[in-house]
């Protein structure tokens, strides 16, 4: 069984908190690099868009529930690393994103709909067009 990425993220957050309590680390990127990285991430996030959780198809709700429960998932490909080859999501190292199928009723295949999860809490993206566009799920609406 795969460990859902958001559980790994919570463990990582605990490790970061422990490190911060123990003392700061004196290693930081030069300011020019930090600004460039921040600008690139902001531009990418703006290109993604948002979608209200309530506006998602019911099958996307089912997929998000399965992710939170750790499965079982309907397809063996569910939970695999999403490579972000399109470069539409914010840039992160390989393994940061994972993809899950959103079942498309009547489709003989997995269809085009997916949920992509990041490692942050509620960092979920929906695509209805097989990675041509993404919308971050807004759980507040």
UniProtKB/Swiss-Prot annotation:
Enzyme kind, highest EC tier: lyase
Main location: secreted
Reaction(s) the record says it catalyses: [RNA] containing guanosine + H2O = an [RNA fragment]-3'-guanosine-3'-phosphate + a 5'-hydroxy-ribonucleotide-3'-[RNA fragment]
GO annotations of cellular component type: extracellular region
Record keyword Disulfide bond present: yes
Location in or out of the cell: Secreted
Enzyme Commission code: 4.6.1.24
Keywords per UniProt: Disulfide bond, Endonuclease, Hydrolase, Lyase, Nuclease, Secreted, Signal
Any matching Pfam family: Ribonuclease
Family assignment from sequence similarity: Belongs to the ribonuclease N1/T1 family.
Molecular-function GO terms, alphabetical: lyase activity; ribonuclease T1 activity; RNA binding; RNA endonuclease activity
Tree of life domain: Bacteria
Disulfide cross-links: 52-141
Record bears the keyword Ligase: no
Name of this protein: Guanyl-specific ribonuclease Sa3
SUPFAM superfamilies (alphabetical): Microbial ribonucleases
Matching InterPro entries: N1-like, Ribonuclease/ribotoxin
Gene3D superfamilies according to UniProt: Microbial ribonucleases
Gene: rnaSA3
Catalytic machinery residues: 99 (proton acceptor), 130 (proton donor)
């Amino acid at each position: 069984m795969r460990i859902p990425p958001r559980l790994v993220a919570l463990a990582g957050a605990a490790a970061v908190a422990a490190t911060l309590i123990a003392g700061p680390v004196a290693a930081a990127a030069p300011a020019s690099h930090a600004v460039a990285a921040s600008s690139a991430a902001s531009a990418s996030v703006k290109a993604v868009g948002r979608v209200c959780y309530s506006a998602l198809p019911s099958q996307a709700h089912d997929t998000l529930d399965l992710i939170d429960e750790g499965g079982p998932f309907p397809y063996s490909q569910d939970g695999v690393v999403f490579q972000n080859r399109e470069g539409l999501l914010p840039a992160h190292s390989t393994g940061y994103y994972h993809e899950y199928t959103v079942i498309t009723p009547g489709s003989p295949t997995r269809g085009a709909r997916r949920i992509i999860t990041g490692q942050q809490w509620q960092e979920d993206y929906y695509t209805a067009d097989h990675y041509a566009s993404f919308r971050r799920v807004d759980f507040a609406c």
